[in-house]
Amino acid sequence: MPFAEYFAAVWAGTSAELRGSAGSGVSGTLGDLLVLARELQAPTRLAKETLDEARAVQFPGLDGVLPGFGRQTPNDWGLGLEVRDAKSPHWTGARNSPRTFGHFGRSGTFLLVDPDAGIALACLTDRPFGDWAVDAWPRLADAVLMERGS
């Protein structure tokens, strides 16, 4: 199935649009991002096995650079989802569990899921990713977890 058809099937009923590359060309609303957050917590559109594979570390021990946060040893990733593990510094909060996973981008947007805390956190901004996010995002994630008592 061509990717555009797959995208349309998965995102049916939302305003999400594919405007270019799957890696950086998805546009949508906060509501659309929350649909994805719910799906990543309790899949109904994806097979549970697909989600399990997507959030599982694919190449254990592979080092790399986490944009804005520097070299990470290791820099674990699933299939399109970054896995927090023991990375430091990191864009999620210090209180987030190592099983936390998600993705962020140049648009200043992120989505994380912390399965141990039972939360998802989505953030949309009108500012491109930069130094401001390196400071603000971990503090936001920690504040949400503190508010929940996690």
Walk through the language-model features, giving the residues of each.
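Catalytic loop of the DD-peptidase/beta-lactamase superfamily, centered on the K-T-G motif
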Residues: 1-150
